[in-house]
A protein has these predicted regions:
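Beta-rich interaction/scaffold domains
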Residues: 149-207
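Bacterial N-terminal signal peptides that target proteins for export
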Residues: 2-9
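Bacterial Sec-dependent signal peptides at the C-terminal "C-region" and cleavage site
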Residues: 19-26
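Active-site- and interface-proximal helix/loop "cap" or "latch" segments in soluble metabolic
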Residues: 26-151
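Bacterial N-terminal signal peptides
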Residues: 10-19
Length: 207
């Protein structure tokens, strides 16, 4: 094989690797619609928002969507008998283009968004749909923080720095930790659990 053909082969491979690395990633987030000024933070409306969050290779949001209408399915399955009013509020959120507020934002940007609280809307809430606005923010954060936390957990330690016995412990903590992170409902719970997992990994003895 000539040097020219080899060079072309390496170039094509490099392009494919780069293209794959830059491929957008779709994450899934969900959060209960909750909160009421008179009833308190634990009041629930009987449904959850279920959204997709598409991010680029830098973790910046390309799009937030619910193209499969999973939120509407959650509303339809409502057990407290408020499906009609909940559907109206969700429709108001969608018509207010709430998803578009997240375009080009990072995790930290989303955390800083001021959607307020039901009964006391913030500047980033969709008018008349504050509970839905808060739930979408929480769902987006759950998706982003879970993805980032799993990546941090997996890459936190280099297995080569540990003896075989400690490597087995390392793998066990990561495997079980990842499974645990995926069960958590809020981004705050995920961040707290990640910190605890890091402490466990820090306690392992290196070579």
């Amino acid at each position: 094989m000539s040097k020219k053909i080899k060079a072309i082969g390496f170039f094509v491979t490099a392009i494919l690797v780069f293209a794959f690395a830059c491929e957008p990633e779709m994450l899934y987030g969900t959060a209960k619609v909750a909160g009421s000024t008179p009833a308190g933070t634990n009041y629930e409306y009987g449904y959850s928002v279920c959204i997709d969050v598409t991010v680029d290779d830098q973790g910046k949001i390309i799009k937030v969507s619910d193209d499969e209408k999973n939120t509407e399915a959650s509303i339809a399955a409502d057990v407290i008998g408020a499906a009609a009013s909940n559907k109206a509020y969700w429709k108001k959120y969608l018509s207010g283009k709430g998803f578009e507020k997240y375009k080009n934002l990072t995790i930290e940007d989303v955390k800083k968004m001021n959607v307020g609280f039901p009964g006391a809307p913030g500047v980033d809430a969709v008018g008349g749909a504050t509970a839905a606005s808060l739930a979408v923010k929480n769902a987006v954060l759950q998706a982003l923080v879970l993805d980032a936390s799993i990546k941090k957990l997996v890459n936190y330690k280099n297995p080569d720095n540990y003896k075989k016995g400690e490597q087995n412990k390392l793998e066990k903590i990561i495997k079980e930790g990842r499974a645990h992170l995926e069960t958590l409902e809020t981004y705050e719970e995920i961040e707290k659990a990640l910190a605890e997992l890091k402490q466990k990994l820090d306690a392992l003895k290196t070579k």
